[in-house]
């Protein structure tokens, strides 16, 4: 009976979400744990079969760092963004497109999902430009050169719409090009937010390795289960948001301001976290609303 009650609880959410598009960002932590990846993909396949149109964007940070170290390259980050020289860019593209994307697509196929892997280059899905980062150093503002780190100039969502309309699950790696053919490494959180905005998605779901937005970043028990966009912006400006959570929060803020209805930041390592967040009243992570 308990299982039946859970299904009944999910019914209004399933009706509300039917035929809507959701962009789901899978973090690099899932790539190094086959059980987490398998469980995550099963959840997304279930979303597909109840009539939701999922779009998956993936990172691959841990695997990139591991491969870099094998080549004698030392990973370096600035505010959660990987500094990417030419050698690093070659490793990034090899790992994200050649290994991680293929692994996710294969996992979908094994679990009954019709997935298609693509990068931001394919069909000019994402046209990128070099990212210019400005930081305060004392009283001065300095420009930090991140190398081949890019940002989205614009998104052409047509190829994703074609795939969704024909029953496929797009799986996107955050490698993109500018119109001159230069290849860039884009932050996967940012790419997920930009694609969600271009599609006017119902939801943007960020899977990470922390419970969600924390009132105190050093205390996992301080989870904020529901927060307004204005409150999140205030936390960001006060420096409460730190490290790898910065690009996630920035992507969420931009997406909601661009028409995405809701965003969720949840712990993707917890079993069935997507289903619990979407189909139960309590949820499991943080929901951000306008």
From Swiss-Prot:
GO terms for molecular function: acetylglutamate kinase activity; ATP binding. Substrate binds at residues 60-61, 82, 185. Pathway: Amino-acid biosynthesis; L-arginine biosynthesis; N(2)-acetyl-L-ornithine from L-glutamate: step 2/4. The record marks 25, 248 as: Transition state stabilizer. One of its GO terms (cellular component) is cytoplasm. Keywords: Amino-acid biosynthesis, Arginine biosynthesis, ATP-binding, Cytoplasm, Kinase, Nucleotide-binding, Transferase. GO terms for biological process: arginine biosynthetic process via ornithine; L-arginine biosynthetic process. The keyword Kinase applies. Its main location: cytoplasm. Catalyzes the ATP-dependent phosphorylation of N-acetyl-L-glutamate. Belongs to the acetylglutamate kinase family. ArgB subfamily. This is Acetylglutamate kinase. The lineage of its organism: Archaea, Methanobacteriati, Methanobacteriota, Archaeoglobi, Archaeoglobales. The gene is argB.
């Amino acid at each position: 009976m308990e299982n039946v009650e859970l299904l009944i609880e999910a019914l209004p959410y399933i009706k509300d979400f039917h035929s809507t598009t959701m962009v789901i960002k899978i973090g690099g932590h899932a790539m190094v744990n086959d059980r987490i990846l398998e469980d995550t993909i099963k959840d997304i396949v279930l979303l597909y079969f109840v009539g939701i149109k999922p779009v998956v964007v993936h990172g691959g940070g841990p695997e990139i760092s591991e491969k870099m170290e094998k080549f004698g390259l030392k990973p370096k980050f600035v505010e959660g963004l990987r500094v990417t020289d030419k050698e690093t860019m070659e490793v990034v593209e090899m790992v994200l497109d050649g290994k991680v994307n293929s692994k996710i697509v294969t996992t979908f196929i094994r679990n009954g999902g019709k997935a298609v892997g693509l990068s931001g280059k394919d069909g000019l899905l994402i046209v990128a430009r070099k990212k210019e980062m400005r930081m305060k150093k004392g009283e001065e503002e300095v420009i930090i050169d991140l190398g081949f780190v890019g940002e989205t100039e614009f998104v052409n969502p047509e190829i994703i719409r074609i795939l969704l309309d024909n029953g496929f699950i797009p799986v996107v790696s955050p490698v993109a090009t500018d119109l001159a053919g230069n290849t860039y490494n884009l932050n996967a959180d940012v790419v997920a937010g930009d694609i969600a905005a271009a599609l006017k998605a119902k939801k943007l779901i960020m899977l990470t390795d922390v419970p969600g937005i924390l009132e105190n970043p050093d205390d996992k028990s301080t989870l904020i289960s529901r927060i307004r966009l204005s409150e999140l912006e205030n936390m960001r400006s006060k420096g409460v948001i730190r490290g790898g959570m910065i690009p996630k929060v920035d992507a969420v803020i931009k997406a909601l301001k661009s028409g995405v209805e809701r965003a969720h930041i949840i712990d993707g390592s917890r079993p069935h976290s997507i289903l619990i967040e979407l189909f139960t009243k309590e949820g499991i992570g943080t929901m951000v609303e306008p």
